[in-house]
């Protein structure tokens, strides 16, 4: 508690503002320690799950996706679970909140982001070290995921009417953006807002497919999307089928909504 630290650290001789600064610094040190302990704990669980128990994937809606292992992955977790279960490639994965890495050397930082939401446009200097955006900057988790939204092309042949001729034409490939196992918590609103903006700017057909466990989870996701995007925007996107919802174990439902 503050009172015990107040006497233990000898802050009683300091001015009030200085003592509060010292307390804040102590909180930051404790947060760093908590993140280190969380990394050790998650590394242990990761080892148990995949090295000891040998957990394998069960049947899900993701089974409808061909070449799933070649997908680009925006990972909100600290562990590389998608690689273990679906064979995705690390070079095509962005750990937006950092990742566990017990093998890193002492001169490399812990990249795990573990903070609170930044709800205000104005920067509150007292809360900055605890906020996710600040930690993402300091820990350099980057914006690699934005590359996932760049246009990709395929060649199609257009037939010239009235002739037997056709000529090649570069067309933009559609993108299916599948959100699996995420509550769409507004804590990550800036990432979702950026993803929607990039998809709209891309000029290609796109669809955000949100998977849900049950009806309660679906309602929660819709509520969170309304907070992140605004009610009118969400209504617009669902009306144009740019946003759809599929139960997480519904392979047939996923097949129906995937853009070709």
Walk through the language-model features, giving the residues of each.
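SIR2/sirtuin-family catalytic core signature
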Residues: 163-260
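A broadly tuned preference for mixed-charge, low-complexity surface segments
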Residues: 119-155, 226-249, 257-260
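Glycine-rich anion-binding loop/nest that anchors nucleotide
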Residues: 71-77, 127-192, 207-214
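Extended, H/D-rich, highly charged conserved domains that either
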Residues: 1-150
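Generic alpha-helix signal with a bias toward terminal, lower-confidence helices
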Residues: 18, 88, 101, 105-108, ...
């Amino acid at each position: 508690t503050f009172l015990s630290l107040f006497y233990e650290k000898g802050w009683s001789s300091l001015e009030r503002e200085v003592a509060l600064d010292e307390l804040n610094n102590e909180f930051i040190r404790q947060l760093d320690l908590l993140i280190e302990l969380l990394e050790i704990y998650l590394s242990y669980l990761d080892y148990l799950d995949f090295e000891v128990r040998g957990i394998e994937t069960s049947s899900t809606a993701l089974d409808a996706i061909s070449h799933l292992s070649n997908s680009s992955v925006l990972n909100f977790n600290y562990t590389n679970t998608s690689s273990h279960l679906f064979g995705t490639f690390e070079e095509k994965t962005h750990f937006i909140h950092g990742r566990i890495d017990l093998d890193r050397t002492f001169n490399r930082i812990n990249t795990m982001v573990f903070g609170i939401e930044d709800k205000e446009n104005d920067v509150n200097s007292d809360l900055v070290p605890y906020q996710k955006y600040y930690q993402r900057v300091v820990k350099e988790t980057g914006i690699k995921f934005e590359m996932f939204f760049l246009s990709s092309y395929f060649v199609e042949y257009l037939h010239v009417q009235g002739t037997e001729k056709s000529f090649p034409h570069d067309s933009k490939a559609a993108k299916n953006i599948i959100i699996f196992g995420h509550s769409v918590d507004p804590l990550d609103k800036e990432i979702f807002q950026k993803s929607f903006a990039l998809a709209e700017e891309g000029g290609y057909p796109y669809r955000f497919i949100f998977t849900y466990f049950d009806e309660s989870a679906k309602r929660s996701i819709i509520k969170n999307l309304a907070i992140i995007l605004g009610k009118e925007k969400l209504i617009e996107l669902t009306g144009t089928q740019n946003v759809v919802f599929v139960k997480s174990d519904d392979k047939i439902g996923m097949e129906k909504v995937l853009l070709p």
